[in-house]
Amino acid sequence: MNINKIALIYNHNSKHLAIIEEIKKLYNYCKIEEAEVIIVIGGDGELLHNIHRYMHLNIPFYGVNLGSLGFLMNPLDTKKLLQNIHESTVSILNPLLMQVEDTSGQIYTALAINEVSIFRKTNQAAKFRIEVNGIERMSELVADGALVATPAGSSAYNLSASGPILPLESNMLCLTPICSFRPRRWHGALLLASATIKFEILNTNKRPVNATADFQEFNNITNVTVKSTKDKPVKLLFNKNHTLEDRIIKEQFGG
């Protein structure tokens, strides 16, 4: 990959400003709108926020990890930064499109790179009905919540909720309950990426529910529809010896 123009994004309140200043001195950077690659320094959260902010530009993102986990990031190598970008591999992520309706009848849409989640707002468990492609698959799930995860997001919140990890090219989605009470032994479902999943919230007055698309939260919802979209693909760059697919495989063996 031949790259001449790169933009740099970082948190100006970062505790790693000394390292960031070193990177800034080594290379020349351009405006984000003019870039061929956007470098994001920080952790997964910083990267996700900036993907949402700039994904409309259709510019590849290269994350440099100065956070904790950094699953979507690359290890810091200041002097080989440009070389690693030139030699990087591209992973295409298709986000989830979430549409929610709240108790006032307002409808909102949002995109998620990792997952869409719905969860109880009070101490009482949520109750909801699940449809897949217009067919009722569960008349009542009683749980703390549920989530739909992309392959890239399957090793995040989904894994913590005991959902399976999906290979990046699997063309599937995870539907995973969060602390399911009834049916107690239901552990979720694997669905084709073309599926449309709908959650209808039951007893919203007594058991209010919120929904999130990554970090965007919506309150007091009555229904949520989730589907994958190929209209807004996200390009992530990874070092050739540290690809996202390799990381996903490693996670499945406890790595």
From Swiss-Prot:
Organism: Rickettsia conorii (strain ATCC VR-613 / Malish 7)
Gene3D superfamilies, sorted: Probable inorganic polyphosphate/atp-NAD kinase, domain 1, Probable inorganic polyphosphate/atp-NAD kinase, domain 2
Name of the protein: NAD kinase
Record: residues binding NAD(+): D44, G45, H49, N114, E115, D144, A152, S155, A156, Y157, N158, L159, S160, Q216
Single GO BP term: NADP biosynthetic process
InterPro entries reported for this sequence: ATP-NAD_kinase_N (IPR017438), ATP-NAD_kinase_PpnK-typ_C (IPR017437), NAD/diacylglycerol_kinase_sf (IPR016064), NADK (IPR002504)
Localization (cell): Cytoplasm
HAMAP family assigned to the protein according to its UniProt record, in alphabetical order: NAD_kinase
Catalytic machinery residues: D44 (proton acceptor)
Summary of the function given for this chain in its UniProt record: Involved in the regulation of the intracellular balance of NAD and NADP, and is a key enzyme in the biosynthesis of NADP. Catalyzes specifically the phosphorylation on 2'-hydroxyl of the adenosine moiety of NAD to yield NADP.
